[in-house]
Amino acid sequence: PYGRPITLGDTRVSFHPAGHVLGSAQIRVEDPDGVWVVTGDYKRAADPTCAPFEVVPCDVFITEATFGLPVFRHSAPAAEIDKLLRSVALFPERAHLVGAYSLGKAQRVIALLREAGYDAPIYLHGAMEKITQYYESRGIALGELRPVKGVKKADLAGTITLAPPSATSDLWTRRFPDPVTAFASGWMRVRARARQRGVELP
């Protein structure tokens, strides 16, 4: 559990929420020489699908910095969701296909859509089904979700489907009526990346 220390000789180790995905953690290590905190991915923004990032006082903070450059100034999540929902309303004859990582990002997008009042079924690529079911088993409410496999092309008009990023540029997308492609990633702040992936709604 978060915050419960483990003693190893004269060293105390504890795990603390990283706010990245369900169960993600920073590791706090304390010994007579000081306190270190080591973390991989973490997120300070609010996320309805996981425990919030905890600021852990320390002498040394060891982190990665994927989005450390000034170009990465992320928009408010609610604004990005609003952009998606406005596009769905504007193009009811088209399917909206959102590329998102299967662990964490997909579930966050779903939860943010629900917070914005979107209560229609959301369709999932098969690769996302099990991990999303696990989130639900841990008490994360995500509303009505359906597998996209086997759904008729015409029935996907006006819907939102989440799929792994690799699927959005694959033959798999041919099952959708004139899809609008989006990608839920901070990398879309780099325009060349968005163009490279053929993203219509970055």
Locations of regions flagged by a protein language model:
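C-terminal regulatory/interaction regions
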Residues: 139-140, 147-202
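His/Asp/Glu-rich metal-coordinating catalytic cores
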Residues: 1-100, 104, 115-116
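Short, acidic/turn-prone active-site loops that include or flank metal/cofactor-
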Residues: 42-44, 66-68, 126-129, 185-189
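A short acidic, often aromatic-flanked loop/helix-cap motif at beta-alpha or helix-coil junctions
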Residues: 3-8, 22, 129-131, 152-155, ...
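Structural motif
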Residues: 35-36, 59-61, 95, 121, ...
